[in-house]
Amino acid sequence: HMGRFLNPGNESFGEITNSEIYVDKTGLLEYTNKVISTTSKFICNSRPRRFGKSITADMLSAYYSKGCDSKALFEKYDISKCASFEKGLNKYNVIHFDVQWCMMDAGNADNVVSYINNGILNELIEEYASVIPATVTTAYGAMSYIREATGCQFVVIIDEWDVLVRDEAQNSKVQEEYINFLRGMFKGTEPSKFIALAYLTGILPIKRLKTQSALNNFEEFTMLDARHMASYIGFTEDEVRMLCNKYDRNYDQVKSWYDGYLLENYQVYNPKAVVSIMLSGKYQSYWSQTGSYEVI
């Protein structure tokens, strides 16, 4: 049973892999399989706009969600060669949502936290009515009962996690509600039992929260400190060279037009910018269209 929040299907990722250019980043799943159900299972990966954040979120969702069968979808990619391939494949209750989209659908920021909470809760009740007491009013309360009754843990993927922190900075009521929601979901003894993996992605790192201790159990991977996430954050130099060969573009020209970020030992390129050059061949000023581009 596929839901909007709970156990979504794999169509979005399927569509991405059907694109003219898809660069295999499924190696990230080998890392998440390694940290799943360990103390390193809380991940916040922040990167600038247009850096393929949603693609990563869709990939994680397609791989872990019990709502679909993704074996054939992943079989042609790197993760299928890993010993852990079958271990996580479609084995978890996945909750996946994009805060930006929820905010539009909820109509305004004031209702967004209850919109998200109730949206998840209603789908959990639909699927697991028999194990959730009628008095439960929070998504995370329901998750706790479900794990207790079924043993099945959750993978929670939040795209644009920081919208309410970024765009609603003046709205302290909404911020407080949202941070309490995240704490209920991720912080403390009980969440550590029902969460198998949490993956938050957005532009800001958690350390930018004024009340950052609220979520100090998250490992942060940022553009300035990417560590083992580096090769999954953008396109690497090797990947861009390979695309240049395929599309008959001059690598040095691409490189001088686009001075990649240096991350660890990887020169990392913005995927959308590179794809745009490969397909159009136009070296226009890409950044002017992407909004502000500060490194945080």
Language-model region placement:
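Phosphate-binding site recognition
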Residues: H1-I296
